[in-house]
């Protein structure tokens, strides 16, 4: 089996070449050389210099070589690894631009020639694109080349009949929000620097995201392109990227079987064990026997009339999919709440303000109450609805049009989701984690809003059954790529207190999962974790992994080194890995046993029996909480 890794074959050194031109200003001289050679030249008061890999290299134009002076330097990778990595990236960028590729931020290279128009909209072209990333594995450097597609307008922005939210500048590689293109004048949004009229509009093309593909009706075709043509992107690497042969071995990285790990995930239900989560309908919830209370909320009597046939088929017919699923999952009884005065099972809400009738009635009720809210239209922002409904209700909004033609698997998913939100219910137990009841898993996400110049910190704690022990979020912190460790310490103490209150003792092991890298002082973090002398492990989780293969890796884990792994979750869409790096491990588990637990956390909770989470559950929780204000409450079963 092969991975898209190509070993760097040149010496791990950087060569610094110096140039002196007494007839030219150094800044201007450096700028001209950078433009002509497609690589950055630096300047000082009197000198210009270039940093390149330690290979034979001649600058353009040839006569400029006469300005080269004898002074040069060789800097080894061990002396300055950051310089070596930056230099490799810059040289790769030059080679791509020299060979008819656009550069796009994030080390993406868009083929100018390898493109084709979409069948569903010929004004949009799919360009074969390669994303490049360097990896250091067991002291050797590799370039990872990941094929993908970029969707650009066929013509420059001012000539394009189709427009999108963002413009891509083919010269700078940057994207900008599109403002207008009237009377031959193209305007873009520069954020804090305001709106600008561009000087060279021919350099700007519309860039279409997956969301815009939905808007314009070609999202299905994009999915098919990835499904049917991404394989050819891998096959073209050797032929298309021949120009990189001077620095890399263009043969793929051969993955030996001892580097492949398979974790057998088994679900234990009440009446059986299976590797398939869908067998929950066959074997019933691991723990249930709960009554389920349901309240229906409608926007108007007209709405009730329009969907009454669908409601009767679903909720009055005892042989319906709804009742069948209720009993399959082990619920003991269904109770439809009624309005106290009228005895009606229809409760009303205002579709404009989302105020509900009988709010006091619901606030005084105890137990698990599912609120099925029928919506007339899609709500772009559902926070207002969540704010107005009592906090003790478990909200299940559904569009009226979907209820009228609802599929059986959707009904089953709704019932399953209800069980997920009831604390007394346990759909299943992951057998790999069943004996880890004294281990606590903490997820941390630090996200940034560069426009507002603020950071948000979210932290969760989850046990081996997927129960959320603790969840909190800090909004609008001072923008910083590092976590505020005073907050982390305070939250850690809160988590331990919550755990102790539930279990009357502290956990024996804590595994801390960080979305991204630990940029903070690790020693301080270790001191925080040592408060109660609990054994711990620190793990970095990178969800933007470039390493992949044209072969099927789903449900496999790749061992890159003793502490570095990539797992490929089972998904219905494109194969994409998640990198796990174990930074610190002072638990009694070895690294592979830690990895097994982390991977099992992707299955410890399923949002529906038809969907897997891609990230370990503690991070899935904080990612959702960090990205939304209140909407996460519809998906994350945490009622505090």
UniProtKB/Swiss-Prot annotation:
Cofactor note: Mn(2+) supports cleavage of all guide:target combinations, Mg(2+) only supports gRNA-directed cleavage. Cleavage probaby requires 2 divalent metal cations.
Coiled coil regions in record: none
Active site location: 445, 481, 515, 623
Signal peptide segment: none
Domain text: Has 4 domains (N-terminal, PAZ, Mid and PIWI). The N-terminal and PAZ domains are joined by linker L1, the PAZ and Mid domains are joined by linker L2. The domains assemble in 2 lobes; the PAZ lobe consists of the N-terminal, L1, PAZ and L2 domains, while the PIWI lobe has the Mid and PIWI domains. The PIWI domain assumes an RNase H fold and has the catalytic residues. gDNA lies between the 2 lobes, with its unpaired 5'-end anchored in the Mid lobe.
Function: A highly versatile argonaute that uses 5'-phospho- and 5'-OH- guide RNA (gRNA) or DNA (gDNA) to cleave target RNA or ssDNA (tDNA) in all possible combinations; has no detectable activity in the absence of guide. Uses short guide sequences (18-21 nucleotides (nt) on average) to bind complementary target nucleic acids resulting in target cleavage in a site-specific manner.
Name of the protein in its database record: Protein argonaute
Lineage, top ranks: Bacteria, Thermotogati, Thermotogota, Thermotogae, Petrotogales
